[in-house]
């Protein structure tokens, strides 16, 4: 299944100029994908900006189902040192926000899949940050009795998610 083959609906662009800019930028894509991208860009300056910033990646990822694209974006953040983690997570956040929005607006995913994907990425982000920061503190000798083997478990640190995060219902608000 490709992204285009799974589309069931398209948003109507509020800003025709923004939609036209995206149609021109992505003129090489399938007509249905252009409808989705144009409608999305014409309703969300934020998502339009991501489309333009991540155009090369987006073209490649639209050949796959959204699950594969989102997993690829999330995976790119794993195994990084704390110095590189922040920028990698910001890039992954942009990419995942865009793909989740397109899957939602294109009718590919139900609401539970949308909120689940956002929650899963938030969970991964917190996990990666805790482990990277714990690793830094272990290297600095600031966690007595903890060694490199303890990084995988966050040296026993617990992050408790409640509310929307705990219920797996994170959204864009």
Predicted segment positions?
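Non-catalytic regulatory/linker segments of enzymes
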Residues: 1-173
């Amino acid at each position: 299944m490709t992204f285009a083959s799974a589309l069931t609906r398209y948003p109507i662009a509020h800003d025709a100029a923004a939609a036209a800019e995206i149609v021109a930028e992505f003129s090489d894509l399938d007509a249905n994908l252009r409808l989705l991208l144009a409608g999305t860009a014409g309703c969300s300056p934020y998502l339009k900006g991501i489309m333009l910033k991540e155009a090369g990646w987006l073209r490649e990822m639209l050949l796959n189902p959204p699950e594969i694209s989102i997993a690829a974006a999330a995976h790119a953040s794993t195994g990084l040192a704390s110095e590189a983690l922040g920028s990698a997570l910001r890039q992954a956040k942009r990419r995942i926000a865009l793909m989740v929005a397109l899957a939602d607006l294109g009718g590919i995913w139900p609401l539970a899949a949308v909120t689940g994907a956002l929650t899963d990425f938030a969970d991964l982000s917190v996990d990666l940050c805790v482990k990277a920061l714990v690793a830094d503190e272990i290297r600095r000798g600031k966690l007595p009795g903890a060694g490199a083997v303890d990084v995988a478990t966050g040296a026993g640190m617990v992050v408790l998610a409640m509310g929307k995060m705990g219920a797996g219902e994170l959204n864009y608000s």
